[in-house]
């Protein structure tokens, strides 16, 4: 019996054997037969080799004797069975490689080919997403792409990625995955795991469309959105949904197709870990939501919850690069003038102290306001990226407010009340100041077209569409007007101070003191404008007249447009106290003690 291209051929068998047995080499493809491993002994009995003996019906046992080879390319196997004492002889002729394989020596003597991960150098498990990689890098790349995660590098974006240090910098690890040939589209084309959607209150829209924007990279104002229906996505609720993608990629594109966002090295120093803010906000939001719901069945043990909060605050503290200062000073202690004017109590009655600032309310350090966008930047900007960018701007704004000595002097309770009342105005001023960095016009244009398509599919009520469209129009109009005025960094800083120290918000205490700080901010802004723009007589009036427009914008819609995709139904107001408590001595101690 022969095969078309046999590696082993049976030349002859002894005809005296009535029911001859057969020697069979079993490969991975041969299954379904009962096999028995037996020992073959040569004629002298000095050596033994194992073979597989089987009969057509899988029954019977036998003894296999390995005889001396008659030629250099042949070996003899002599076997007997329990019901037949006459030995049968099978001569197997093969090449030397097959002989070694038959004797079980090939796998031992021949070195195995081992492939190594092109990303970290660990032992590879195969080719994944277009590159030979290990299970660790395969899983990391898959998670990063599927969850649209964004990372930041604390160094100069050239960290060493190897088996032992691959977890130290996620930014550089993802960057190397892309450089070594891993393809994002290979992950996105896989079948995604079944995800049970939680029921959430309806917000503004329920859509799974993806928005692709074809545009001149140098001109974000002429974007032309194109809608592509995502048939596989589950319906989501909210003005922005996870299936929505916006292409606002920057001109910095590598030859290998990797899209990166150029970051200012100095800004990266002060905002090195801001890429983790989305995770911090999510952790705090989920914890706050669990506490508010009182769901004991899903709550973790108390010590684990405390540990989660500790890690979240520690991450946030590192991200904002807080200094090793002591706890916020009391009114009587005074504040060092390095961050602005020194604070002194000039008079005190039985109720509240009166505070006066010696020197300027703001220093040159308060003028710097550099927002570092997440990177690497995806080709099609998704909701997670928009929310992450917005969270960076929000936290940067609050960090700026906390750095003002006069603000610190008001105390924690007053700080929380002020920020809760004006966070939307501070955030909007930040949007106007960073509109070019964020490509704000492109994002808003995409949202508008997304909402228009929602109207056609009856996903939103007419009243709700009108409210949201009016809000977006007001936001765009405000940003455009500030761009026309060409507001500089000093003017933006003083405008934010005027907004921050607004005494007319309901529920505030110590309004007279807050009003004093606001008046000082207005006077310093006036002095600056008169000295810097002396030829523009009405510049100050044109700037101040823009502030009332901030009060016309709904904080609820701002929250839904920029943050709902990140924190769900948890309000920004509930997160503000966590952020403002970071400067206590407890969390300053954690900054140096814990590692990210």
UniProtKB/Swiss-Prot annotation:
A zinc finger (NR C4-type) spans 117-137, 153-177. GO terms for cellular component: nucleus. Changing residue 68 to E: Some repression of transcriptional activation; Repressed transcriptional activity by about 10-fold. Pfam families: Hormone_recep, zf-C4. It is found in: Nucleus. Disruption phenotype: Impaired spermatogenesis. Mutant animals have smaller cerebellums with disruption of lobes VI-VII. They exhibit a delay in monolayer maturation of dysmorphic calbindin 28K-positive Purkinje cells 7 days after birth. Deficiencies in acoustic startle response, prepulse startle inhibition, and social interactions were observed. Also responses to novel environmental situations are inhibited. NR2C1 and NR2C2 double knockout results in embryonic lethality around 7.5 dpc and increased apoptosis. The modification Phosphoserine is found at residues 19, 46, 55, 68, 98, 219. GO terms for biological process: cell differentiation; cerebellum development; lipopolysaccharide-mediated signaling pathway; meiotic cell cycle; p38MAPK cascade; positive regulation of behavior; positive regulation of embryonic development; positive regulation of myoblast differentiation. GO terms for molecular function: DNA-binding transcription factor activity; sequence-specific DNA binding; zinc ion binding. Phosphorylation on Ser-19 and Ser-68 is an important regulator of NR2C2-mediated transcriptional activity. Phosphorylation on these residues recruits the corepressor, NRIP1, leading to transcripional repression, whereas the non-phosphorylated form preferentially recruits the coactivator, PCAF. Orphan nuclear receptor that can act as a repressor or activator of transcription. An important repressor of nuclear receptor signaling pathways such as retinoic acid receptor, retinoid X, vitamin D3 receptor, thyroid hormone receptor and estrogen receptor pathways. May regulate gene expression during the late phase of spermatogenesis. Activates transcriptional activity of LHCG and is antagonist of PPARA-mediated transactivation. Homodimer; can bind DNA as homodimer. Heterodimer; binds DNA as a heterodimer with NR2C1 required for chromatin remodeling and for binding to promoter regions such as globin DR1 repeats. Interacts with NR2C2AP; the interaction represses selective NR2C2-mediated transcriptional activity. Interacts with PCAF; the interaction preferentially occurs on the non-phosphorylated form and induces NR2C2-mediated transactivation activity and does not require the ligand-binding domain. Interacts (MAPK-mediated phosphorylated form) with NRIP1; the interaction promotes repression of NR2C2-mediated activity. PANTHER family: NUCLEAR HORMONE RECEPTOR. This is Nuclear receptor subfamily 2 group C member 2.
């Amino acid at each position: 019996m022969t095969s078309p291209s046999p590696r082993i051929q049976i030349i002859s068998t002894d005809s005296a054997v009535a029911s001859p047995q057969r020697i069979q080499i079993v490969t991975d493809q041969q299954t379904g037969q009962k096999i028995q491993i037996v020992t073959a002994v040569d004629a002298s009995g000095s050596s033994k080799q194992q073979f597989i003996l089987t009969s057509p019906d899988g029954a019977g046992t036998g003894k296999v004797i390995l005889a001396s080879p008659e030629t250099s390319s042949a070996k003899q196997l002599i076997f007997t069975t329990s019901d037949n004492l006459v030995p049968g002889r099978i001569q197997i002729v093969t090449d030397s490689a097959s002989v070694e394989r038959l004797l079980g020596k090939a796998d031992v003597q021949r070195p195995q080919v081992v492939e190594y991960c092109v990303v970290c150098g660990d032992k590879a498990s195969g080719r994944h997403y277009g590159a030979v990689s290990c299970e660790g890098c395969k899983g990391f790349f898959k998670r990063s792409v599927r969850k649209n995660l964004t990372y930041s590098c604390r160094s100069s974006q050239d960290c060493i990625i190897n088996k032992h240090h691959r977890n130290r910098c996620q930014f550089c690890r993802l960057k190397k995955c892309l450089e070594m040939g891993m393809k994002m589209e290979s992950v996105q084309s896989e079948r995604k795991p079944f995800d049970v959607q939680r029921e959430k209150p309806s917000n503004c829209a329920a859509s799974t469309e993806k928005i692709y924007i074809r545009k001149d990279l140098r001109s974000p104002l002429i974007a032309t959105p194109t809608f592509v229906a995502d048939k596989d996505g589950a319906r989501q609720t909210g003005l922005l949904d996870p299936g929505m993608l916006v292409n606002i990629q920057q001109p910095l594109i590598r030859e290998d197709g990797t899209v990166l966002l150029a970051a200012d090295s100095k800004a990266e120093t002060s905002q090195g870990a801001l890429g983790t803010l989305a995770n911090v906000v999510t952790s705090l939001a989920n914890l706050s939501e669990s506490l508010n719901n009182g769901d004991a069945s899903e709550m973790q043990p108390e010590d684990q919850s405390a540990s989660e909060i500790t890690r979240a605050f520690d991450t946030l503290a590192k991200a904002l690069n807080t200094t090793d200062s002591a706890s916020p000073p009391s009114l009587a202690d005074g504040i060092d003038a390095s961050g602005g004017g020194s604070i002194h109590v000039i008079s005190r009655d039985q109720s509240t102290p009166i505070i006066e600032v010696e020197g300027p309310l703001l220093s040159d350090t308060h003028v710097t306001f550099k927002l570092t966008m997440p990177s690497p930047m995806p080709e099609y900007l998704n909701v997670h990226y928009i929310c992450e960018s917005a969270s960076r701007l929000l936290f940067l704004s609050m960090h700026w407010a906390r750095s003002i000595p006069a603000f610190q002097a008001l105390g924690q309770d007053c700080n929380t009340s002020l920020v809760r009342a004006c966070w939307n105005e501070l955030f909007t001023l930040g949007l106007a100041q960073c509109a070019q960095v964020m490509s704000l016009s492109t994002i808003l244009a995409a949202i508008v077209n997304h909402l228009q398509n929602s109207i056609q599919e009856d996903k939103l009520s007419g009243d709700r569409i009108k409210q949201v469209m009016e809000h977006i129009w007001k936001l765009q109009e405000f940003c455009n007007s500030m761009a026309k005025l060409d507001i500089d960094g000093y003017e933006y800083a003083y405008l934010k101070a005027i907004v921050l120290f607004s005494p007319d918000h309901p529920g505030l205490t110590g309004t007279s003191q807050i009003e004093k700080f606001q008046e000082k901010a207005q006077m310093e802004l006036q002095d600056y404008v008169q000295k810097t723009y002396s030829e523009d007589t009405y510049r100050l009036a044109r700037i101040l007249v823009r502030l009332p427009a901030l009060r016309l914008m709904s904080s609820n819609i701002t929250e839904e447009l920029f943050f709902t995709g990140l924190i769900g139904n948890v309000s920004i107001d509930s997160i503000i106290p966590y952020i403002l408590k970071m400067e206590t001595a407890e969390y300053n101690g954690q900054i140096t003690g814990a590692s990210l």
